[in-house]
A protein has these predicted regions:
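Short loop/turn motifs that connect adjacent beta-strands in outer-membrane beta-barrel proteins
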Residues: 48-56, 71-73, 113, 163-171, ...
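Residues that define the transmembrane beta-barrel architecture of outer-membrane proteins
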Residues: 56, 98-102, 147-153, 169, ...
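Outer-membrane beta-barrel biogenesis signature
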Residues: 1-82, 183-185
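Outer-membrane pore/translocation modules
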Residues: 124-244, 250, 293-294
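Structural signature of outer-membrane beta-barrel domains
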Residues: 65-71, 115-119, 123-127, 176-184, ...
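Residue-level detector of the transmembrane beta-barrel scaffold of outer-membrane proteins
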Residues: 57-61, 73, 115-117, 156, ...
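Residues on the lipid-exposed face of transmembrane beta-strands in outer-membrane beta-barrel proteins
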Residues: 49, 60, 64, 104-108, ...
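Outer membrane beta-barrel transmembrane domains
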Residues: 73-83, 236-341
Length: 341
């Protein structure tokens, strides 16, 4: 089998920064991309790209997150006889969506090159939709929906392809599987018009996501990036809602990428900056034996992360995402407490 990546010791230079210990005389040069000497710089970068767990070591990752989304839409239903003179109804919709979650993940290093990960979450969602119709007088209607419960359980495996010898980037292959344990959009109760009476806590579909990420040291930072393809598995719903017969539904697959860098200010504190983008393909739904497709989505977000090493076993991480495209959530914040054993 492939030899494990070379282990590299590290020392603190006069500026307080981590640097590899020089190799003994006659030994091959130490690979500058060795991840073990870069844990401080890598601690703040997004999950799924960061350094693998050490062989035989277990860690728990406790986290809480909050996501805020809002959308505004102005619709005119009528005719415009001359520019600026409209006959009909003006309808304005405003939707505010809040999602919070508590997550727990267990990570274990099978070898120095391979890590497995299992995670579960409890999700609470709340949507407030306000509709204003303007004809002779304004008519306002507000709808509040909520839902909470177990989310979709996920499992993943990551494998370090190379050791970063001769200054090359370290490449890591990953495979993630997402279950449908959460209550999906076709599992929740609906009224006689097919309108949901509460919110889903899961997608309702299984999915798999292969990915490749890289880590490339460029002193004093470490550059990171990833590409991924998330494939949903289609499902035959086979039920009638609001007078419409729902057949097979195939949620749109997603192509994702990210790029950024991590920087260690001292042995305890590091931060990261990055950008991630996903192109979500149209969802196809079979309604009354007619296949309809939704629009595709472009979801982009700026990322900012911070990490502080509390003790040898505990660290505190905070990650922010700010949406920069119309389809992206406005803001997402994740507070994580990794615990090493």
């Amino acid at each position: 089998g492939a030899a494990p990546p070379t282990q590299v010791a590290s020392q603190v230079n006069p500026n307080g920064q981590m640097q590899p210990t020089p190799a003994p005389s006659g030994a091959p040069p130490v690979a500058p991309a060795q991840m073990e000497a870069r844990r401080e710089q890598l601690a703040a970068i997004p999950e799924g790209i960061a350094v693998l767990s050490r062989a035989g070591k277990l860690s728990l990752d406790l986290s809480t997150e909050y996501t805020r989304s809002s959308a505004n839409r102005l619709v005119f239903r009528g005719i415009e006889i001359v520019p600026g003179v409209q006959i009909g109804v003006i309808e304005a919709n405003e939707a505010d969506r809040d999602t919070s979650a508590v997550n727990i993940a267990a990570k274990y290093g099978l070898t120095s090159r391979m890590e497995v990960d299992l995670r579960a979450s409890y999700i609470r969602r709340n949507d407030t939709i306000t509709t204003v119709q303007q004809r002779d007088e304004a008519v306002t209607r507000t709808i509040d929906l909520s839902g909470d419960g177990i989310g979709d359980v996920e499992a993943s495996v990551r494998y370090q392809i190379n050791g970063g010898e001769r200054g090359r980037p370290i490449f890591i292959a990953g495979l993630r599987a997402k279950s449908d344990t959460g209550e999906g959009p076709f599992d929740i109760p609906r009224d006689e018009f097919g309108v949901a009476t509460r919110l889903a806590t899961g997608s309702g579909f299984w999915g798999v996501e292969p990915s490749v990420s890289f880590l490339y040291p460029s002193d004093p930072a470490v550059i990171f990036g990833s590409v991924s393809y998330f494939a949903h598995l289609p499902r035959d719903i086979n039920k009638t809602e609001g007078g419409a017969r729902i057949g097979e539904v195939d949620p749109g697959d997603a192509i994702g990428m990210s790029i950024g860098f991590g920087f260690s200010l001292n042995p305890k504190f590091s931060f990261s900056l990055g950008y991630k983008h996903s192109y979500i393909r149209p969802t196809s739904s079979e309604l009354n034996d007619i296949v309809e497709k939704s629009d595709s989505l472009q979801v982009g977000a700026l990322q900012f992360g911070m990490s502080y090493l509390l003790t040898d076993r505990f660290s505190l991480n905070g990650n922010f995402e700010f949406g920069v495209t119309e389809d992206a959530p406005d803001m997402r914040f994740v507070l994580r407490l990794p615990i090493a054993f």
